[in-house]
Amino acid sequence: MAAKEVKFSVDARDKMLRGVDILANAVKVTLGPKGRNVVLDKSFGAPRITKDGVTVAKEIELEDKFENMGAQMVREVASKSADAAGDGTTTATVLAQAIVREGAKSVAAGMNPMDLKRGIDLAVEAVVADLVKNSKKVTSNDEIAQVGTISANGDAEIGKFLADAMKKVGNEGVITVEEAKSLETELDVVEGMQFDRGYISPYFVTNADKMRVEMDDAYILINEKKLSSLNELLPLLEAVVQTGKPLVIVAEDVEGEALATLVVNRLRGGLKVAAVKAPGFGDRRKAMLQDIAILTGGQAISEDLGIKLENVTLNMLGRAKKVMIDKENTTIVNGAGKKADIEARVSQIKAQIEETTSDYDREKLQERLAKLAGGVAVIRVGGATEVEVKERKDRVDDAMHATRAAVEEGIVPGGGVALLRASEQLKGLRTKNDDQKTGVEIVRKALSAPARQIAINAGEDGSVIVGKILENKTYAYGFDSQTGEYVNLVTKGIIDPTKVVRTAIQNAASVAALLITTEAMVAELPKKGGAGPAMPPGGGMGGMDF
C-alpha cells in the first residue's frame, strides 16, 4: 500500500478551499445571459467551447491531491444537479462555493461545524418551502419558450423549437437532440414508441457510422419467453425471408444457438434481422409487450394465451414503418396498430393511473402512456463548424431539461431573484443555538451569490444590484442584465424552472455542509520521479576493462 499524507484542520480546509475556488471560478464565468464561454482542450480533435457549467466542471482535475478533493466534491454538486434537473449546474456551483467559503470562516472562528451544518439544513428547508409556495404553474406555450430561451443563454430560436416540440409530442413525449449536417437547426417530429433496450449483439448494426440498426417496413415478433433454439421459429423465418422484409425480434432474451444463427444469417445477408430484449420486468414486461403489440397491430406470443412459437404466422406479427435500435434504445415509428385499439389501451392506462396508490407505479404507468400517446421529437442542431454545433447542442440540451422541469414543478422569477427573495424569509428563522443561527446566516449570504455573479458577468457592480433588488418588495422585480434595466422578470420572460433552482440549492448545501465539517484529509503521497535503476556492473564484454 502506498504511503499517505494526512493534513488536519486549517491546513486541510485551506487546501480544499483552494480546490473549490479553482473549479468554481472556472465554472461561474458562464453564468447569466452575458456569461462567457470556456474553452476545453481535448486530447484528440478540436478544442471544445462550452457555456455549460457541468461540462466545464467535469474537465477539471488538479495536480495537488488535496486541492483536487475539494474540486471533485464541488464537481459532484454540478453533476448531481445535471442528473436531477438537467440544468442549474452553474448556479449550484456558485452557491456551493459561497457556502463553503462562509462556512470555513465560521469554523476557523471556533464554531461547532455540526451545528453549522444543522443550521444550513434548516435554512435550506425554509428556502425550498418558499420556492414551492411562490412557484407558478406553466400554462402557455410562450412560457415554455421563455424558459427554453433563458436556459439557452437568451437564444430565442432554441426556445421556440423546444416549445414547438413540447406542443407536438405533449408533455409526455420524448425529445432528443442531435447534431445536424447543415447550417440550419430543424425540428423533426416522429410519431413512435421508444423503450430503453438496445440490440443484443452489435453484429445486427446496419448503419456502422451511427452504430445503430435502421429497418424500414419491418415485421416485429413479440415473444415473452427466451429464445435459445430457432427450430420452432424456422417456418416463420422462411415466410419472412419470402416477403423480403426485415424482422425485429423482441423477446426476454435471445441466446446461444438462436443468437448465433440469427447473427450468421444477418452477416450473410440472407435475413435482415435484429433482436432486442423486452423492456421492463415481471408483470410490467407483459404489459409493455402488450403495448408494443397493440401499437404495431401484432400479437404478443405468450404461453398464458396458449400460443406456441411454431404456430405463429405472419399475420400475428406486428408491423412498423421504421424501427431504429441503438446500443441503449429502440424506437418503433408508425406502428400498424388500429387507432381504436390504441385509444382503448390509452384510456385503460389512464384509469390505472387514477387508481394506483404507489408513486413508483404511477410514474411507470405515465411512462407507458407517453410511449403510446406521445411521440418522438428530434431537434437537429446546425452550425457552421463542428465546434459551434457542439456548443449549441450543449445549450439545447440544457434548455430541453429546463422546459421539462418547468412543466413538472412550475416556474419562479429568474436572474437569481427567487433565491434572493427566499433569503429574506430566513431572517426570523428560529434555531436552537447561536452556531445554528450562524449556519442559517451562511445560507442567507450565499443565496445572493447567483444574482451577484450574473451582474458581475454583465460588467455591473453585484452588491449594488442585489441591494436595489431587495429594496423593492415586488416578488418578481429584478435586474435584466441583458438590457441593464430593472424590470418585472416574469412579464419580461426571465424565468427559471422551480425544480432547477430547488435542486441547485439542495445539492450545493448538501455537499458544502459536509465539506465544512471536514477535520482531516488523507491522500496518497506523490511518487518521486527518480531515474530508472542503474545498469548492473560488469555489463558489456567480459574480461575487457577499459
From Swiss-Prot:
ATP binds at T30, L31, G32, P33, K51, D87, G88, T89, T90, T91, G415, D496. It catalyses: ATP + H2O + a folded polypeptide = ADP + phosphate + an unfolded polypeptide. Coiled coil: none annotated. Pfam families: Cpn60_TCP1. Keywords: ATP-binding, Chaperone, Cytoplasm, Isomerase, Nucleotide-binding. InterPro entries: Chaperonin_Cpn60_CS (IPR018370), Cpn60/GroEL (IPR001844), Cpn60/GroEL/TCP-1 (IPR002423), GroEL-like_apical_dom_sf (IPR027409), GROEL-like_equatorial_sf (IPR027413), TCP-1-like_intermed_sf (IPR027410). GO terms for cellular component: GroEL-GroES complex. It is found in: Cytoplasm. Signal peptide: none annotated. GO terms for biological process: chaperone cofactor-dependent protein refolding; protein refolding; response to heat. It is an enzyme of class 5 (isomerase). PROSITE patterns: CHAPERONINS_CPN60. It comes from the Bacteria. Together with its co-chaperonin GroES, plays an essential role in assisting protein folding. The GroEL-GroES system forms a nano-cage that allows encapsulation of the non-native substrate proteins and provides a physical environment optimized to promote and accelerate protein folding. Belongs to the chaperonin (HSP60) family. Forms a cylinder of 14 subunits composed of two heptameric rings stacked back-to-back. Interacts with the co-chaperonin GroES. This is Chaperonin GroEL 6.
